[in-house]
Amino acid sequence: TDATGKPIKCMAAIAWEAKKPLSIEEVEVAPPKSGEVRIKILHSGVCHTDAYTLEGIDPEGIFPVILGHEGAGIVESIGEGVTSVKPGDTVIPLYVPQCYECKFCLNPKTNLCQKIRVTQGKGVMPDGTTRFTCKGKEVFHFMGCSTFSEFTVVAEISIAKVNPKAALDKVCLLGCGISTGYGAALNTAAVEKGSNCAVWGLGAVGLAVAMGCKAAGAARIIGIDINESKFEIGKKFGITEFVNPKKFCKSVQKVLGEMTDVGVDFTFECIGNVGVMRAALESCHKGWGTSVIVGVAAHGEEISTRPFQLVTGRVWKGTAFGGFKSRDSVPKLVDDYMNKKLLLDEFVSHKLSFKKINEAFDLMHKGESIRAVLDIPE
């Protein structure tokens, strides 16, 4: 039935407050306003960033909210002035938009479009209001996406139109985790052929980093995790050797120094632990080693090292969404997946129905899943 211009009633997973399980409720999704698009979400991954907000440690976290930012679906209707997509198009919502106009979009050095940053951070659409209501209460948006809902409304600049033949239960992962890790290696670090790399944290993002290092032609890729159940799967993504830091009485810096003759060319922290970030930098090769921070640390945490580490030629960098300019890159990444240039299926360890969403969070916290993907319409 055509609901263009009218509100849609559907099911969504609502976070009413921090530290409480999500609750599946009927919500009303308003039609898209000017420059907005309403999307029928078919699949969504569950990411640590969703948990970060749910646990109440995100300073921008506001409740009640519909979480989820790793989704894929079909355009249901478009607001006034929208030209880049039409109803029926296959799309991936983007938490890093690309407006093509702000000074960030015009600068090739960054992918951090700022056009709707302020309102997105406040959980509202660019006009300052929300499109979700539940039981008469306004419900906030999350990261400009809110994919834990059968329908969502996003800004046109936050949408990648992708190949309609793509398997949406796989390419939804390009909305966050896989693009983030893969691009950290290819774009931010610009890993070189024949180099040695080390990756801390072998979840979906760390494994995607390894996949990027392999694509760049790295000679050795060392995977570091205290959960050894991740080691076997790591081999699929190109990791050549594994280190469990708990098995050594010396620092991981020393262990890697001995393994690589002085240090590693490229290191990646995919956990969000500031102590590990320091270890990753200090494991870098003197004179040219580069360390990339990919993990999100808790609010207010600070990094430290001795300036001598940088004076002697190490570089410390950070990355968001893998440095990919989102609307330009995500459609190409989908094509790369379809042309077997990058893996996605191997990241999906669990497929769950929407009503089992809290189970997906439990699996993630226990370290039992790489990525759980939800089938959104029941």
Curated annotation (Swiss-Prot):
Q: Which InterPro entries match?
A: ADH-like_C, ADH-like_N, ADH_3, ADH_Zn_CS, GroES-like_sf, NAD(P)-bd_dom_sf
Under Pfam families, the record lists: ADH_N, ADH_zinc_N
Q: Which domain of life is it from?
A: Eukaryota
- Where is this gene product found? Cytoplasm
User: Which reaction is catalysed here?
Assistant: a primary alcohol + NAD(+) = an aldehyde + NADH + H(+); a secondary alcohol + NAD(+) = a ketone + NADH + H(+); S-(hydroxymethyl)glutathione + NADP(+) = S-formylglutathione + NADPH + H(+); S-(hydroxymethyl)glutathione + NAD(+) = S-formylglutathione + NADH + H(+)
The EC number(s) this enzyme carries: 1.1.1.1, 1.1.1.-, 1.1.1.284
What residues correspond to the site Important for FDH activity and activation by fatty acids?
117
Name the family the entry cites: Belongs to the zinc-containing alcohol dehydrogenase family. Class-III subfamily.
Name of the featured protein:
Alcohol dehydrogenase class-3
